[in-house]
Amino acid sequence: MGKQPVKLKAVVYALSPFQQKIMTGLWKDLPEKIHHKVSENWISTILLVAPVVGTYSYAQYFKEQEKLEHRF
């Protein structure tokens, strides 16, 4: 006599339609959170944005000079 497999019922997790307060913590003190993130990471932001803006402006300047060179 072997053991018979026992069928287990699956557990289903669901939210009550009357108690859906999942995202409230995300919006709580949002301006304060944004200020904290910006003041904490401003050096990294500058180091990321400065080369991108510099490269873009150089490319635009070079393209404009090339257009003006072939004008005459």
UniProtKB/Swiss-Prot annotation:
The keyword Lyase does not apply. It comes from the Eukaryota. GO terms for biological process: mitochondrial electron transport, ubiquinol to cytochrome c. The chain crosses the membrane at residues 42-58. It is a single-pass membrane protein. One of its GO terms (cellular component) is respiratory chain complex III. Belongs to the UQCRQ/QCR8 family. Component of the ubiquinol-cytochrome c oxidoreductase, a multisubunit transmembrane complex that is part of the mitochondrial electron transport chain which drives oxidative phosphorylation. This is Cytochrome b-c1 complex subunit 8-2, mitochondrial. It comes from Arabidopsis thaliana (Mouse-ear cress). The lineage of its organism: Eukaryota, Viridiplantae, Streptophyta, Embryophyta, Tracheophyta.
